[in-house]
């Protein structure tokens, strides 16, 4: 996984996953005791009584400095001008040091590293689908994850899944919109 063994990882971000009584790999996506349930936005003792599921309506951040640092690193690795590889590594290492993860060298800062670091740092914050599309890993079969395409071990999905559908009401309200069928 992204953190190695969750039971022994020194990366503080790995502690966001509750593993007591759970098996690491999901065998049935409908069972709460399968997979990696996260407590990232669980806040059962803050201001109000817990709900029966012990999850609260805690707001989550939309903009984070960590996201900006990782965007900077991605732009540099993709060849963008105005940034330096050393500064990108410093930004990434600031995040990793804060999380008690090992630092990296400039040679380790690759696009594959960045997409994995985005998954570790920004998990459950609503970025993953867009990240996978931007990195060319959301559709097709070259990058699989459990339950991709509805198959336990993952399977390829068609490229039209890279597109968000235009809601029917929007199409009906504006005849100039053209849907991209898939």
Label each region the model flagged.
Residues 39, 92, 130:
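A broad, low-specificity signal marking well-ordered, structured residues that form hydrophobic/aromatic
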Residues 1-65:
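Flexible, polar/acidic helix-loop-strand segments at domain edges
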Residues 11, 59-95, 111-125:
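Extended, hydrophobic/aromatic-rich amphipathic alpha-helical segments that build helical scaffolds
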Residues 60, 96, 104-182:
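Long, intrinsically disordered, low-complexity segments
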Residues 24-25, 83-84, 130-131, 139:
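Flexible loop/turn segments at secondary-structure boundaries
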């Amino acid at each position: 996984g992204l953190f190695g063994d969750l039971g022994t990882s020194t990366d503080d971000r790995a502690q966001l996953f509750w593993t007591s009584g759970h098996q690491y790999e999901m065998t049935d996506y409908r069972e709460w005791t399968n997979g990696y349930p996260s407590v990232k936005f669980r806040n059962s003792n803050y201001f109000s009584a817990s709900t029966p599921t012990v999850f609260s309506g805690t707001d989550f951040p939309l903009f984070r400095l960590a996201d900006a640092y990782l965007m900077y690193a991605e732009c540099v690795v993709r060849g963008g001008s105005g940034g330096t590889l050393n500064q990108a590594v410093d930004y990434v290492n600031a995040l990793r040091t804060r999380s008690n993860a090992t630092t990296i060298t400039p040679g380790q800062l690759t696009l594959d590293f960045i997409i994995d670091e985005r998954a570790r740092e920004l998990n459950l914050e609503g970025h993953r689908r867009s990240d996978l599309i931007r990195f060319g890993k959301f559709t097709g079969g070259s990058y699989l994850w459990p339950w991709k395409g509805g198959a336990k071990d993952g399977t390829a999905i068609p490229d039209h899944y890279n597109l968000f559908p235009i809601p029917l009401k929007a199409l009906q309200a504006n005849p100039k919109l053209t849907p991209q069928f898939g």
